[in-house]
Amino acid sequence: SRRQASDVYKRQGIDGSSLGLTWAVPFAGILLSIALCPLFLPHFWHKNFGKVAVFWALCCAVPLCAVLGFSVGTDAIVHVLLADYVPFIIFVGSLFVVAGGIHVRGSFVGRPIVNVAFLGLGAVLANFMGTTGAAMLLIRPLIEANAGRTRKMQTFIFFIFLVANVGGALTPLGDPPLFLGFLKGVGFFWTAEHLMLPWLLCSGVLLFIYFLIDSACFKKDVADGFKAPAETKAFAIEGGINVLLLAGIIGAVLYSGFSRSGIEFTFLNVHFALESIVRDLCFLALAGLSLMLTAKATREANHFTWDPILEVAKLFFGIFVCIVPVLEMLRAGHDGAFASLVALVTNADGSFNNTFFFWLTGSLSAFLDNAPTYLAFFNLAGGDPAVLMTTDAQTLMAISMGSVFMGAVTYIGNAPNFMTVAICNERGVKMPSFFGYMLWSVGILFPVFFLMDMVFLT
């Protein structure tokens, strides 16, 4: 029956149903390190966060090799690094380099209406250049616009909500889970057709809430003596060649999604499609061209440094390794350690519970990589795109909304979240701690998500 959860994909060599919850300890460890060390051991963390990430990666990799066998363990680690981590870093790194070569010049002043325009524009652009591309393009001019303001933390929190996550819900280009769904057979325009109303409602409500909060903060800033500088600089975009290079990155993503050569290469037991190799080589070439063709003064105007992308690369190395057994347990479905959670998505009569699909996919996406989480629940819902796009369209909506929208709940829910925070910290913008951010996200986003659930899924 299509209403029965399908067999979930198992990576060759690892049976997720045989793994207990203790295998999740390294993943919990790296999450707690990211959350607590900056609070209680800031100096140690700043100097050693890369070593901490490697430590937790070893805490996962060594037991995998010792308990499951050396070849099984190394195959699993090599697979996640070559098939997932390296392409991920190449993609976000290329966007970071290219977007960092575009300097938007102008006398923008961080008034509430200007900030709302930035956030709204970013939410739209995220669907065409991805959440990472839109975030990296707009974060620097937004920081410049708000440079003179004292109370501005809320602007960058909502930037993560809207530009780095919710905004990218309309196309497969917007967010990795939707692109993965596209590769599995979901129509390119299906997401725009079915998620347009949820996107409009969620984005509209968040922009309205932000406007109210920022207006109150702006009045206090003015009362404390903030004066908007005279708007004298003419609007201009420096490093325009990078706009073309950014279009090239988008084109490479589309090529890898639409092309089906059937040609594969195998390296260290990992299979690579020709399209994926060409795509990643294009990313590297375009990033290299950006570094060669962009004037040094343009990057200096953006205060461009390598620190944010290096921080992401180091921490996500540990996250990607530690996540291996957790995802295998999730992929094991009803036979794995998360069986009690998985059982919630199916009602007693065999029908799908879309509310639980939404909240479970979303809650796990807030802490795990949202792309494989999307895939796991896509498979639990039957895995047939023809059925999920029609008869069970509401279920696919729930999975898509959960994986994209709830990436905003934590700093690690989506790559641009962490990159945005890293750039803000580097530029002297005070951001909340890991748990401090979650107070904002849970307090603001969850009521909006409950509204989305009631309107579209029940």
Description of each model-found segment:
Residues 2-9:
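Short, small-residue-biased leader/transition segments that mark boundaries at the very start
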Residues 10, 42-43, 62-84, 96-110, ...:
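Transmembrane alpha-helix boundary signature
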Residues 12-23, 44-51, 74-86, 189-198, ...:
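Interfacial loop-to-helix junctions that mark the boundaries of transmembrane helices
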Residues 22-34, 48-65, 85-95, 120, ...:
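Hydrophobic mid-bilayer segments of alpha-helices in multi-pass membrane transport proteins
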Residues 63-65, 126, 136-151, 155-157, ...:
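Membrane-interfacial helix-loop connectors
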Residues 151, 170-171, 180, 189-237, ...:
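Juxtamembrane and boundary regions of transmembrane helices in multi-pass small-molecule transporters
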Residues 191-293:
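Core mid-bundle transmembrane helix pairs that form the ion/substrate translocation pathway
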Residues 246-376:
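Transmembrane helical segments that form the transport core of multi-pass membrane transport proteins
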